[in-house]
């Protein structure tokens, strides 16, 4: 089987590519100015080819924060109901978000996710399924293992810390808080042919927890040991 080409090789329009770059530049200014985002682990990101990026979910800013943490273009999933709310719906559609059913069971979303992974792109998912109620890593839902198995791409674990302090679920608007992102070593399914889905779920959970602990410790050092 031929190796997947880098994501930049695919035929998005010039307008689409320029819009993505503009939004990335704008969001980067926001993230650096308001959230002092710091990222560790760039060396773990595959230089080319598809990868499934799995991250914890602390707040509504997470897709932006993870997207900015990678130098390659990032695809992300969004509930189909969000596309009906203008201007948010138009914005996420313009950024090539993949619509999924509210319960995450839609075949069209799964097929599009697999298509983008197999053509060599990065796709971000939040396997916890919803935002954390207290900022900690919640139990992962097993659905992402199907995507990983069918695509055969590496799984890249990522952890965010500080998003919960910036915008917890019970707060209407975001606030200022330093953000730390930790990118972990990719999990290669080609080396785990004898691992079943339950064991894979445990492995991914352990790797994400390791990343989360590193991100939390690094953020605490930046904040003088305080959670702010």
For each of these PLM feature ranges, what is it?
Residues 1-18, 108-228:
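Non-catalytic C-terminal accessory region of glycerolipid acyltransferases
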Residues 2-41, 47, 72, 85-95:
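A transmembrane-helix-recognition feature enriched in membrane-embedded lipid enzymes
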Residues 32-33, 45-104, 112:
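Catalytic core of membrane glycerolipid acyltransferases/transacylases, capturing the structured
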Residues 18, 22, 26, 62-65, ...:
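Hydrophobic alpha-helical segments typical of transmembrane helices
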